[in-house]
Regions:
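Glycine-rich phosphate- or other oxyanion-binding loops that anchor nucleotides, phosphorylated ligands
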Residues: 57-58, 64-90, 99, 143
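Mixed-charge interfacial surface used for oligomerization/domain docking
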Residues: 3-5, 11-25, 30, 82, ...
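N-terminal glycine-rich anion-binding loop in soluble enzyme alpha/beta folds
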Residues: 5-64
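Short beta-strand->loop
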Residues: 88-89, 113-116
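Acidic, metal-coordinating catalytic cores used for nucleic-acid/nucleotide bond scission
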Residues: 93
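Hydrophobic residues in alpha-helical segments
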Residues: 53-54, 78, 133
Length: 286
């Protein structure tokens, strides 16, 4: 049986250690910042982007890679006869899936999955696919099952500031200004059927108390959460805040809790201080 390679856009936000352990091949997005082209989380970090914004309102340009870039990536992975299952950032958020699909159209043994999510909402799907690979499943069978994983993957997060959304034209400046004055922190939900984002509950108060309510609200929506693993993914919160959220999840019986930092692509849109919990359910649910 040919070797099966699991590959994913860098926006799946798995840590370097996870990518190495599970042998996931990462495809980095490009970040254009201050006139230079960078590779996401390779030669630029979210903190550099945040610093640039607060220094002189510099904003990065992010975007999906071209079909040709994907074609080259897939060609390198399949050169020895390997088969590839590749996970993309959700098609509702980016043209990455469309471009990767175009690249794979005339290539044998390359299967492209629309993650219909973002960040470790896709990372969870990638880990599930890796376990299928390690169990000896073929690339075609993995792709068939993986194409439905988004129905069980749940992603949400809470913003600490709306400045970056406003600067990027994703919410009115006045709304962001008033949100800051009123200490409003909007919850953002990812629709796991379409992959689109929508505004959820609006929280007010200090970050730690807001995150405590957010965790409680989020977990209360589901009765069949898989307790084997859960992600805490953030765009730069203090160790104390991350530890407090971890404690909440430990108290609720989660066995493995991963803490990862969001990629530049994700972080540049949500701004610093954003945090989310991302997990799977046993059965498909919105």
């Amino acid at each position: 049986m040919p070797n099966v390679i699991i590959s994913a856009d860098s926006t799946c936000d798995l840590s370097p250690e996870q990518r190495e352990h599970y042998q996931v091949r990462s495809f980095p997005f490009h970040i254009e910042f201050r006139g230079r082209d960078h590779l996401d989380n390779i030669d630029i970090t979210p903190q550099v982007l945040f610093d640039g914004f607060y220094e002189d309102k510099s904003l990065p340009q992010t975007g999906a890679c071209s079909p040709e870039a994907y074609r080259q990536h897939f060609a390198e992975l399949t050169a020895d006869g390997s088969k590839v299952v590749h996970f993309n950032l959700g098609s509702a958020l980016s043209s990455a899936y469309e471009n990767a699909n175009a690249a794979a159209a005339d290539m044998e043994g390359v299967y492209v999955i629309d993650g219909k999510s973002l960040s470790t909402g896709i990372g969870l799907q990638v880990l599930a696919a890796c376990r299928m690979r390690d169990a000896g499943m073929s690339a075609a069978d993995i792709a068939r099952e993986a194409s439905e994983l988004h129905n069980r993957s749940h992603a949400s997060f809470v913003l600490d500031t709306m400045e970056f959304l406003a600067a990027g034209g994703r919410c009115p400046t006045l709304v962001a200004y008033l949100g800051g004055k009123l200490s409003c922190r909007p919850g953002i939900l990812v629709d796991n059927q379409s992959g689109a984002m929508k505004v959820g509950k609006l929280y007010r108060g200090k970050q730690e108390k807001v995150l405590e309510r957010y965790v409680s609200d989020t977990l209360a929506r589901y009765t069949d959460i898989v307790k084997d693993e859960i992600f805490i993914t953030h765009s730069g919160v203090s160790d104390e805040v991350a530890a407090a959220v971890r404690k909440l999840l430990e108290e609720r019986g989660f066995r493995t809790i991963y803490t990862t930092t969001a990629s530049c692509t994700i972080s540049s849109h949500c701004g610093p201080g954003t945090l989310g919990i991302l997990f799977m359910t046993e059965t498909p649910s919105a």
